[in-house]
């Protein structure tokens, strides 16, 4: 039974009116794939070394949504008789679905989650096409100011709960 729980809070600041829903997904990987068989040694491809777990983000009022993840959702074990495979969180995505069927994604890295750091992203209010789905986290203040004129903010905040 999972025990390493983190709450994920997503806040939309001045979102567009056509936001339909928000969902979350946690992505895990096995960084050291020595524990897994490699069917194609030349390509280095190892199937099954990634795991995705979707989780709901429930509205709590004022354009704020909450959900939770567990770092120990995937189970560390010896799947193939080659040693214990250890899963690690790679990142967490918050996906905003718009009424035009376009999606916008804000990513929280495992380093941000483990250090309990917030992530703020700029998502375009007017999406050009379905490929315009990445929300940006610029480090340059001038770029952030420029994006601020055409974007709404998505703030993702992790907290440890147990």
Protein language model annotation of sequence segments:
Residues 95-162:
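Glycine-rich, aromatic-bearing surface loops/beta-hairpins
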Residues 7-13:
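Short edge beta-strand/loop segments characteristic of extracellular beta-sandwich folds
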Residues 17-113:
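Structured domain cores in non-transmembrane regions
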Residues 2-4:
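N-terminal amphipathic/basic membrane-interacting segments and domains
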